[in-house]
Curated annotation (Swiss-Prot):
Function: Encapsidates the genome protecting it from nucleases. The encapsidated genomic RNA is termed the nucleocapsid (NC) and serves as template for transcription and replication. The NC have a helical organization.
Cysteine pairs bridged by disulfides in the record: none
Gene coding for it: N
UniProt protein name: Nucleoprotein
Lineage: Viruses, Riboviria, Orthornavirae, Negarnaviricota, Polyploviricotina
Keyword annotations of the record: Capsid protein, Helical capsid protein, Ribonucleoprotein, RNA-binding, Viral nucleoprotein, Virion
Subcellular location: Virion
Gene source species: Tomato spotted wilt virus (strain Hawaiian) (TSWV)
């Protein structure tokens, strides 16, 4: 019996050779726990201002493309372009993104920071696409979560219900939200969130269900089609003139034609 390190070459040997192989214990895949990762790495982004955190979320896709072009280092952290095996302590773009969202949600506990986040995040395209009303701290927290990795964030204490309710909403409304199931499987994401909750023995007691219903009520009041209606209303005076040319009587509000 031979014990070897888990590498690409040793996996090939495992699959093609007749000799007995075992991987060294410390090389076995370690179960990743984002809650632990979060506690150990939140300090890495403590210098980021709230505005900078919001800038990251607003430009997430563009930032991701740049970071993934090559190994990306900030401070003492490096996000590798390619990795045969991502370890439990390695930083990835998704983990960084989740850290920033957790940081922002925690900042909503301060009224001044809450107002700053509320005013800035309202202009983010994803929030407008969801038609999410930003009336209180809970709605702002939902806004911060939009586009994030719910299975990762669900492992953090106090983030369980907001994650599972948002996952359910996305699964129920994926067509209205314009989510392509071939690119993002909402049911699979919900399953992953539930798996995380089960692994941490999370109990959906009466208090947790009450909290979940509050988040669900906010999401129920959102209007995924509002973005187009708002944009149409902005140009309503001019657009209505063209409607009249097509024999449609001018309305007080263009959105009434929808």
């Amino acid at each position: 019996m031979s014990k070897v390190k888990l590498t690409k070459e040793s996996i090939v040997a495992l699959l093609t050779q007749g000799k007995d192989l075992e991987f060294e214990e410390d090389q076995n895949l370690v179960a990743f726990n984002f809650k632990t990762f979060c506690l150990e790495n939140l300090d890495q982004i403590k210098k980021m201002s709230i505005i900078s955190c919001l800038t990251f979320l607003k430009n997430r896709q563009s930032i991701m493309k740049v970071i993934k072009q090559s190994d990306f280092t900030f401070g003492k952290i490096t996000i590798k372009k390619t990795s045969d095996r991502i370890g439990a302590t390695d930083m990835t773009f998704r983990r960084l993104d989740s850290l920033i969202r957790v940081r922002l949600v925690e900042e909503t506990g301060n009224s001044e920071n809450l107002n700053t986040i509320k005013s800035k995040i309202a202009s983010h395209p994803l929030i407008q696409a969801y038609g999410l009303p930003l009336d209180d701290a809970k709605s702002v927290r939902l806004a911060i979560m939009l586009g994030g990795s719910l299975p990762l964030i669900a492992s953090v204490d106090s983030f369980e219900m907001i994650s599972v309710v948002l996952a359910i909403y996305q699964d129920a409304k994926y067509k209205d939200l314009g989510i392509d199931p071939k690119k993002y499987d909402t049911r699979e994401a919900l399953g992953k969130v539930c798996t995380v909750l089960k692994s941490k023995a999370f109990e959906m007691n009466e208090d947790q269900v009450k909290k979940g219903k509050e988040y669900a009520a906010i999401l129920s009041s959102s209007n995924p089609n509002a973005k187009g209606s708002i944009a149409m209303e902005h140009y309503s005076e001019t657009l209505n003139k063209f409607y009249e040319m097509f024999g449609v009587k001018k309305q007080a509000k263009l959105t009434e034609l929808a």
